[in-house]
């Protein structure tokens, strides 16, 4: 969950960006298997101890086993080795730009400040979002991968079309 350790949540968010970059490099650029692999990370603001990272892809059903293999391989690599300074910058820069741009909208502030009157941690989290993201290191990304991208808590979901349709 986010409030148990906001910096860890930011570390995990950057790790998710690195995972997505690697999936794009492998699946789109390397294999031409799909155009848009996606990674989503969620740290609950409500339920203690809850959060997830998910990777998804639109791919022909025959490509699913290879996708799962690639995700596991990339996850293991993120757990076992530090990422380069270049890869860290490529993960953080777009995220920081996205945050800065979002902060110019009312929707961002409505979402960020929702509930702040009853939970002041939300204000602290909003204030520290950019500096906390800037602070993420390659070691932090590796620690996040070791904590989250574990084989023992990973599960796969396949959504396939009905046969013949």
Language model regions located:
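M16 family metallopeptidases and their MPP-like homologs
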Residues: 1-6, 28-135, 153-161
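His/Glu-based metal-binding/catalytic segments typifying zinc-dependent metallopeptidases
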Residues: 1-22
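Carboxylate-rich, divalent-cation-coordinating active-site regions
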Residues: 25
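Short, exposed beta-strand-loop hairpins at the edges of beta-sheets
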Residues: 145-147
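Glycan-association/targeting regions that enable binding to alpha-glucans and other polysaccharides
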Residues: 150
């Amino acid at each position: 969950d986010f409030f148990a350790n906001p910096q860890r949540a930011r570390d995990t968010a950057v790790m998710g960006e690195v995972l997505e970059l690697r999936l794009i490099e492998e699946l789109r650029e390397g294999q031409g298997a799909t155009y848009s692999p996606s990674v989503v990370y969620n740290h609950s603001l409500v339920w203690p101890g809850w959060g997830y990272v998910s990777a998804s892809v639109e791919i022909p059903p025959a490509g699913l086993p290879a996708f799962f293999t690639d995700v596991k391989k990339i996850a293991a690599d993120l757990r076992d080795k530090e990422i380069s300074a270049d890869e860290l910058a490529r993960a953080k820069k777009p995220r920081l730009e996205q945050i800065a741009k979002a902060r110019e909208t009312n929707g961002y502030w409505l979402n960020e400040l929702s509930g702040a009157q009853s939970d002041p941690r939300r204000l602290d989290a909003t204030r520290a979002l950019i500096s906390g993201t800037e602070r993420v290191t390659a070691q932090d990304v590796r620690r996040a991968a070791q904590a989250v991208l574990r084989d023992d808590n990973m599960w796969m979901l396949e959504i396939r079309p009905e046969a013949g349709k």
